[in-house]
Amino acid sequence: MSDQQLDCALDLMRRLPPQQIEKNLSDLIDLVPSLCEDLLSSVDQPLKIARDKVVGKDYLLCDYNRDGDSYRSPWSNKYDPPLEDGAMPSARLRKLEVEANNAFDQYRDLYFEGGVSSVYLWDLDHGFAGVILIKKAGDGSKKIKGCWDSIHVVEVQEKSSGRTAHYKLTSTVMLWLQTNKSGSGTMNLGGSLTRQMEKDETVSDCSPHIANIGRLVEDMENKIRSTLNEIYFGKTKDIVNGLRSLDAIPDNHKFKQLQRELSQVLTQRQVYIQPDN
């Protein structure tokens, strides 16, 4: 029964607005407390921003940089609140983490023109894993509010030869938009999308791990953007157009009247030219 309850709860969460995930998740846990751990580990939540007081830069919070009640900054590698024995990446991986944060900071600035990004890496037995986080919130300056949260979890299995690696990428994007205009009123639109891909890539000085991961993330985000734009927003536009005419009502009546008159004329012509039996 618990498996069925979990499946139903996850299916429900997928259909609810992403800007209300925390409230909806809390309500579900109150209804079924036994699902608390499974829901918290399975449902992606909107990313929160914190400030690194050491270097004066923002970073994103998630389960992957949390140890107890403290969160590790990718910039200073310090926990806040301070934690003496918090989990840390190895020296080799920390160096790679610093380079990855700098690379994706440029990627975020190029594609999103703002926002916050963070990269966290951790060691595995035969390689390493990491998460790339990007958050961009709209300021409502054009009467449009919204937020984009992308969470890319990558697992890297390094082959024994050291020349190739297997990459497994799981990406989740949460997006919501709210418009408030005098002509169209208020409209809310939101949802989340998860996609996964696996690929083998060559690892060399010309194509290091960061470049390979960067290409995978870039390709995945482009595909998700395209899916959101063409399918979700396209479908919404079709539905709205079906419910609400863009033309003025008098013009619409005139057009329909013209259609009826043309139809009558064509019908009369068909009757007129029909040969006698």
Curated annotation (Swiss-Prot):
BP GO annotations: actin polymerization or depolymerization; barbed-end actin filament capping; cell projection organization; cytoskeleton organization; lamellipodium assembly; muscle cell development; negative regulation of microtubule polymerization; neuron projection development
Record key words, sorted: Acetylation, Actin capping, Actin-binding, Cytoplasm, Cytoskeleton, Phosphoprotein
Main localization category: cytoplasm
Chain positions with Phosphoserine modification: S2, S263
Domain of life, source organism: Eukaryota
Stored InterPro entries: CapZ_alpha/beta, CapZ_alpha/beta_2, CAPZB, CAPZB_N, F-actin_capping_bsu_CS
In-chain residues carrying the UniProt-annotated modification N6-acetyllysine: K235
Disulphide linkage map: none
Modification type N-acetylserine: residues: S2
One GO term describing the cellular component: cortical cytoskeleton
Gene Ontology MF term list: actin binding; beta-tubulin binding
UniProt-annotated location(s): Cytoplasm, Cytoskeleton
Function (record text): F-actin-capping proteins bind in a Ca(2+)-independent manner to the fast growing ends of actin filaments (barbed end) thereby blocking the exchange of subunits at these ends. Unlike other capping proteins (such as gelsolin and severin), these proteins do not sever actin filaments. Plays a role in the regulation of cell morphology and cytoskeletal organization. Forms, with CAPZB, the barbed end of the fast growing ends of actin filaments in the dynactin complex and stabilizes dynactin structure.
Matches recorded under PANTHER family: F-ACTIN-CAPPING PROTEIN SUBUNIT BETA (PTHR10619:SF2)
UniProt subunit comment: Component of the F-actin capping complex, composed of a heterodimer of an alpha and a beta subunit. Subunit of dynactin, a multiprotein complex part of a tripartite complex with dynein and a adapter, such as BICDL1, BICD2 or HOOK3. The dynactin complex is built around ACTR1A/ACTB filament and consists of an actin-related filament composed of a shoulder domain, a pointed end and a barbed end. Its length is defined by its flexible shoulder domain. The soulder is composed of 2 DCTN1 subunits, 4 DCTN2 and 2 DCTN3.
Family from the record: Belongs to the F-actin-capping protein beta subunit family.
Record-given protein name: F-actin-capping protein subunit beta
Native source species: Mus musculus (Mouse)
